[in-house]
Amino acid sequence: MNLMLTLITNISLSLVLITVAFWLPQLNVYTEKASPYECGFDPMSSARLPFSMKFFLVAITFLLFDLEIALLLPLPWAMQSTNLTMTLTFSFLFLTILALGLAYEWKQKGLEWTE
């Protein structure tokens, strides 16, 4: 009974919100509000704008290290496993690969914003 009541409530609330959002008109329509916005770039201009390669490399490096940190987050739970030696070995190997990647980026001057 509680499941049916919850489902009916959720569906009816969703339908009411969708109906209100669909039927309410925009109060003030300006050209700025009606035009598409794409990260500050003019959507009607050429798609081949000059782009800073240094910014791209720093952004990709940040994304890679951010992903690697996300892979390190489950380590405290992995420490509770029965084979602690294997877990610590893989963790140390993973951190070593991270450190080597960071050292390589640093040596290639990929982390410097200005030259």
Curated annotation (Swiss-Prot):
GO biological process: mitochondrial electron transport, NADH to ubiquinone
Superkingdom field: Eukaryota
Keywords: Electron transport, Membrane, Mitochondrion, Mitochondrion inner membrane, NAD, Respiratory chain, Translocase, Transmembrane, Transmembrane helix, Transport, Ubiquinone
GO CC terms, sorted: mitochondrial inner membrane; NADH dehydrogenase complex
Membrane topology summary: Multi-pass membrane protein
Cellular localization per UniProt: Mitochondrion inner membrane
Record-level Gene Ontology MF annotations: NADH dehydrogenase (ubiquinone) activity
Segments traversing the membrane: 3-23, 55-75, 84-104
Presence of the UniProt keyword Glycoprotein in the record: no
Chief location: mitochondrion
EC number: 7.1.1.2
Catalytic activity: a ubiquinone + NADH + 5 H(+)(in) = a ubiquinol + NAD(+) + 4 H(+)(out)
Protein family: Belongs to the complex I subunit 3 family.
Oligomeric form and interacting partners: Core subunit of respiratory chain NADH dehydrogenase (Complex I) which is composed of 45 different subunits. Interacts with TMEM186. Interacts with TMEM242.
Function, as annotated: Core subunit of the mitochondrial membrane respiratory chain NADH dehydrogenase (Complex I) which catalyzes electron transfer from NADH through the respiratory chain, using ubiquinone as an electron acceptor. Essential for the catalytic activity of complex I.
Protein name in UniProt: NADH-ubiquinone oxidoreductase chain 3
Organism: Phodopus sungorus
